[in-house]
Amino acid sequence: MKPLNIIFAGTPDFAAQHLQALLQSQHNVLAVYTQPDKPAGRGQTLRASAVKILAEKHHIPVYQPKSLRKVEVQEHLSKLNADVMVVVAYGLILPLAVLQTFPLGCLNVHGSLLPRWRGAAPIQRAIWAGDKKTGVTIMQMNEGLDTGDMLHKVCCDITPTETSTSLYTKLANIAPKALLEVLDGLEQGLFKAEVQDESLSNYAEKLSKEEAKLDWSLSAEQLERCIRAFNPWPMSYFVTQDSQGTLQTLKVYQASVLPHQNKPCGTILAADKRGIQVATANGVLNLEQLQPAGKKPMSARDLLNSRADWFKIGQVL
């Protein structure tokens, strides 16, 4: 088994963890492709991606084209003479010319058990939908969106308290090893390509701040899953009104489900040290950890000590 010459394409920390694994392996990373530096923070200063920072630390050439569609970009890729391209959360579309550049193709690490969740937010949607299991898939890329033939899958459980943050960490711990296993056996054909079953596919739409607003006409179970799925971004939230009539927005970090009470959706049923209990279409959502604007997250008990007027029994949110 000879070491492979690899082009790595990725952008966030999740991708950087895969690059780190490659750098510690027998394989050679010839170059790294990552998205252009983006403005960040209040000062909107340009910030390099996690992948770029790691690559430069190891003196690996970094390229940041805005697109891979230009002929000169594709020609440069070809001249690098790599065996394979590894793509992890890169964020740019790979045109057919790029997909056909490398003898062993382009491999992608995807954060779901394909074809269950294709698209931009597979980790979040798995929690949102109430899936009990998820995992990572290593696939050969084609022109479709996460539609390529699957080479290797690794599973992990989704616990009842799982957030996107914790699940992201789980997948980041198992995915690099899965990638290396595929790379080590790629030339020998040790991994048989499996065509995806289109009838089992779902599209994991991007999350939005609009979707993160709690909709009390859903069930308490659905809302509790939303709260976990949308943590750390965009964070589920709701709006209440204080005694002065001012609207107050609160993010929700933690909640639990209580038995149903026959009250209109959005009605505050109780507000005490156990939490703020709100009626939903099915069941009661008990809000346990919240964050008012400009404050740190706090327990419902601590919030009620200073802001009890925000939560009147019988008030409809």
UniProtKB/Swiss-Prot annotation:
InterPro entries in the cross-refs: Fmt (IPR005794), Formyl_trans_C (IPR005793), Formyl_trans_C_sf (IPR037022), Formyl_transf_N (IPR002376), Formyl_transf_N_sf (IPR036477), Formyl_transferase-like_C_sf (IPR011034), GART_AS (IPR001555), Met-tRNA-FMT_C (IPR044135)
Pfam families: Formyl_trans_C, Formyl_trans_N
Keywords, alphabetical: Protein biosynthesis, Transferase
Family: Belongs to the Fmt family.
GO molecular function, one term: methionyl-tRNA formyltransferase activity
Catalytic activity: L-methionyl-tRNA(fMet) + (6R)-10-formyltetrahydrofolate = N-formyl-L-methionyl-tRNA(fMet) + (6S)-5,6,7,8-tetrahydrofolate + H(+)
EC number: 2.1.2.9
PROSITE patterns, per database record: GART (PS00373)
Domain of life: Bacteria
Protein name: Methionyl-tRNA formyltransferase
Role according to the record: Attaches a formyl group to the free amino group of methionyl-tRNA(fMet). The formyl group appears to play a dual role in the initiator identity of N-formylmethionyl-tRNA by promoting its recognition by IF2 and preventing the misappropriation of this tRNA by the elongation apparatus.
Uppermost EC category: transferase
Residues noted as binding (6S)-5,6,7,8-tetrahydrofolate in the record, renumbered to the chain: 112-115
Coiled coil: none
Disulfide bonds listed in the record: none
GO cellular component terms, semicolon-separated: cytosol
